[in-house]
Amino acid sequence: MPTDLYQGMSDFYNAFVQRNRDYKAIATELIDLFGDQQDILDVGIGTGLLVEQIIQLRPELQITGVDTSASLLEQAQQCLGTQVDLHCQDVVDLHLDKMFDLAYSRGGAWAFVNDGNTILLASHILDLDAIQQSFERVAAHLRDEGRLIIISSNANHGKREELDGEVTFERTVSKDGIEGEQYLILDYRCHRNGGLVGHQRVRMRLLDLDRVEEMLVAVGLGSISDHHNKYHIYQKKGSE
């Protein structure tokens, strides 16, 4: 099981992202893209803030969420109760006793980010072969003509928020290049009364859109829409 990068920071992280993401608006747009699909997989569900909004709008949906962070899943359990089936699993080794109509990720495993004029995939999974395997495992859990949606994120920009009179939460962003590979470095720092009380560093692998779509095609997922680079949608080939 990968290291839980958010252990000890999940409460602060939750408050920070609630202030910086309009989950109701994202949920409304996603539901339009879901159409009549019923069995949904959230890859990297985190604390469940997005799913909370989705099930308020579409309580009949059957949603399963996976994440590698036990601390974030604990918050998701408190938020969602028994409405969502939660699993502490790495998507690289995903094994669920269920097939899905649709899967999506918004930064929990992968997200697209706009780097000026270039669209890049930001992946929590760092090894290229492991990224390919994660795509394969999701595709294996999709029914024929099922869809994968990878959502764009603004997490590649720095941000600082005062959560209350004592606590400040900050995200700083940098890039690193190692032997031709590109990485996005996200540093989350929490200060209380000026003193540092928590710090987590998250490193994400960056890949060009064309390369990512070649990898997805290799597991039977072809691009059908990008909704102005906001929601990249891939569909699994049906049985011939």
Describe every region a protein language model picked out.
Residues M1-G35, Q37-G46, L49:
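Conserved class I S-adenosyl-L-methionine
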Residues L49-D93:
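Class I SAM-dependent methyltransferase SAM/SAH-binding core
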Residues A111-A130:
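Mobile active-site "lid"/loop adjacent to the S-adenosyl-L-methionine
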Residues H124-D144:
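A short glycine-rich, Lys/Arg-flanked "PGG" loop and its adjoining helix->strand segment in the class I
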Residues R211, M215-E240:
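C-terminal lobe and adjacent flexible extensions of AdoMet/dcAdoMet transferase-like proteins
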Residues H95-A103:
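A short acidic, Gly/Pro-enriched loop at the edge of an enzyme's catalytic core
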Residues R147-M215:
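SAM-dependent methyltransferase
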